Amino acid sequence: MKISQIEKKKHLYLIKLDNGDSLTVTEDTIVTFMLSKHMVIDSQQWEDIKSFAQFSYGKSKALGFIAFQQRSQKQVQDYLLKHQISPDLIPSIIDSLKQGKWIDDQQYVDTYIRQNSLTGDKGPLLLKQKLMLKGIASQLIEPVLAQTDFSSIAQKAAEKIYQKYQHKLPSKALTDKIIQGLLNKGFSYDLAKGIVSQLSLEQDSQHIEDLLDQEFDKLLRKYSRRYDGYQLKQKLYQALYRKGYDSDDITTKLNDYF
């Protein structure tokens, strides 16, 4: 067999043989086999070229995927499968990328956690969950988490929640909101409690009274359509207490109204 034509197609090349066969290959395939027009090849060479072309194309797709953003090994594997690269070729493509340091799950973990320390707000539990969803083994994650101080990250996250709700919630509800917010972000309960204890959550009595008045009026409109008398009073008390208002303050408010 003889190569009758080599035609460039964007980033790939179309190779045509004189027997009518054709194959689209990467530039790496051209260079590796030193392919040129009029070159004579046998059937075994042609099979080798086709096999390498598939490998090279898959590797090229993977390199494009990781060119501008670091990826885990599983992310690259999933990407190749999605783009219909043969499952039989993927292990060799991954090995080649790992040898070239294009894929390194340990480095991925280090970078991910370091970036969170600089600009993120996630705790260790959430970080571990997200990294494991990317296919990274826990034994690569846990040592890095153990060496990371999360107190300053939790502090910033707590202050952000505080700023959002300080004018909307009474002290107890605000405390619960901050702790729950930190738990949702993957921080431990002990750390969340410790961080909250360092915050100044005291509110002046007038502010608390204003909040209570607003919440009372809103709940009164809601419950007065269905309840009255003692039942209404009980519903209001329970709802206000659940929202974190002090029992004595609620009782005073209810006695003033009823």
UniProtKB/Swiss-Prot annotation:
This is Regulatory protein RecX. The keyword Cytoplasm applies. InterPro entries: RecX_HTH_1st (IPR053926), RecX_HTH_2nd (IPR053924), RecX_HTH_3rd (IPR053925), Regulatory_RecX (IPR003783), WH-like_DNA-bd_sf (IPR036388). The keyword Cytoplasm applies. Gene3D superfamilies: Winged helix-like DNA-binding domain superfamily/Winged helix DNA-binding domain. Keywords: Cytoplasm. It holds the Pfam family RecX_HTH3. It comes from Streptococcus equi subsp. equi (strain 4047). GO terms for biological process: regulation of DNA repair. It is found in: Cytoplasm. HAMAP family: RecX. The gene is recX. One of its GO terms (cellular component) is cytoplasm. Belongs to the RecX family. Modulates RecA activity.
